[in-house]
Every structure is written in C-alpha cells, then in structure tokens.
Amino acid sequence: ATVGHYDLGLINKNKNLIQDLKNHKFDIVYLVGQDNLNFEKKDEFIIYQGSHGDNGAELADIILPGSAYTEQDGYFTNLEGKMQKAYKASYPPGESKEDWLIINEIAEYMNNRKLFNDKDELESSMINYLNLQKEKSYEEKIKENNELNEFHNETLKIKMKDYYFSNVIAKSSKTMIECNNSKLNLKSTGTEG
C-alpha cells in the first residue's frame, strides 16, 4: 500500500498524524479498511469503511460496509513500482459495496455530483495521472516531495507477531484459525523445530 500511496501522491506530510490522533486533535476520523490503529477514542466521530470489521469497526460511530480486496477489481503496485490489475474473485455479500462506489456516493451526497460516472472513468483518470508522473525524472519527484528521501532511506521493519493472523481477513478465516491452532499445538509439544 505504501508504494501505491507514493505513486498517487497520497503522502502524509504530517509526521505527527498518529500522535495527533492519540492526542485527540481530530473531530472526525475516516478509516478505510484501517484495523491496526492503537488509540483510545474520546470525542472523535469515527467513520469506518471496511470489509471485516476489526479494531476500526469497534471504535466506529458509523460503519460503511465495504468489499474485501478479493471482492472488487483494483490495481496494486508491487515493490518494483509496477502496477498490476487484480480482478475480483467473488461479489461482495449483502449491502457491502466496492470502496470506490462508497466514496463516490459520499461525494455525490456532499457536492451533488459524483467524482466519477463509472469505474472505467476512474481507472482512466488514475492511469492518466500515473502516466504523467512516469514522465517526471526521479530527481524531479524528489524535489517535489522531500518525503521520498526519507522513505528510500528507511530501514524496513517487519513486526510479524503471528503470520496466520497478519490481517483482519486472515483473522476471520476458519482455515487460518486451524493453521494457527496447529502451530500452537506443535509449540506445546516442543516439536516445532
């Protein structure tokens, strides 16, 4: 997700965003699939948009049922910076909708107009933007946003507490729960290797 955010220019220039959240400096917090924030809610009005409802949904005043990544078409950027299209494996259940549709409907409600008329227009707009960005040299991108310097010089730290429960979808999976239980049973016998 981080590489994709950089590609789209969605970069947090406020280094203290999480600290500001913990210090209750926001009136409204909109979480899109964000389930790993660690903070205590005070007076914030929290809107959660997501598929499986973990920590973010527990804090929410309003829940907008979104689709899991397997239930919506989308684009992903790998660590090489290459964009890849992914197609949905199934349709979202019940009242849940694809993320772009929810955001489009909110925009229509607030501004009396949609951001995009359909998914093709959204994809075309995104690809045109990315093509314009590709024309810029690496040096130009760094000059535009000094945050890139810090990103490229960061040490990658992976805190993997439990592979089988590494995200909200895995935590909800019967198969992953069984895998985790098998791992725990091996540890209790001392035969885990």
Regions found by a protein language model. Name each.
Residues 1-138, 189-193:
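Non-catalytic alpha/beta scaffold blocks inside enzyme catalytic domains
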Residues 123-193:
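Long, low-complexity segments enriched in small/aliphatic residues
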